[in-house]
Design a protein with these regions (language model features):
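Bacterial N-terminal signal peptides that target proteins for export
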Residues: 1-8
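Extracytoplasmic copper-binding redox domains, predominantly the cupredoxin/blue-copper superfamily
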Residues: 20-135
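Bacterial N-terminal signal peptides
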Residues: 8-17
Length: 135
């Protein structure tokens, strides 16, 4: 009887661990033709995450005025707000349509900024968005 309870308990723990790993938050981003980032359901384009959180970025890119030679129409790069250095693993070029990226939020809490790295229009410099990592 004791072995049965132990086995059932172990199976429950294993199932719970698999379920916890499968829970990845999806963030819907629009890299729009007006050279602006937009977040589904939000008035202000800002992303807030927990340090080390697993994320699925689902980014829809719409063509602006121009594109790069490789067909990219926008970029999505995460920078440290303090010194504008790039965050490793957070540098994507976007082609028209929907693309998904599995990423892990930075482990260091603080303010970051998402910038477009493809010259997409005359207003390209305005294509940025606040990104906050909470403890």
């Amino acid at each position: 009887m004791r072995k049965t309870k132990l086995a059932v308990g172990l199976l429950c723990v294993m199932w719970a661990a698999q379920f916890a790993v499968a829970q990845i938050r999806t963030i819907e981003v629009l890299a729009d033709k007006d050279s602006r980032y937009k977040i589904a359901g939000e008035k202000t384009p800002e992303i807030r995450v927990k340090a080390g959180e697993s994320l699925l970025l689902r980014i829809t890119a719409r063509k602006a005025q121009s594109m790069s030679r490789d067909g990219s129409i926008h970029g999505f790069t995460l920078l440290h707000a303090s010194d504008r250095s790039r965050v490793p693993g957070w540098d994507f070029t976007l082609k028209p349509g929907v693309q998904e990226f599995h990423v892990t939020a930075p482990s260091q809490p603080g303010e970051y900024v998402v910038v477009c790295t493809v010259i997409c229009s005359d207003d390209h410099e305005g294509m940025n968005m606040k990104f906050v990592v909470e403890p």
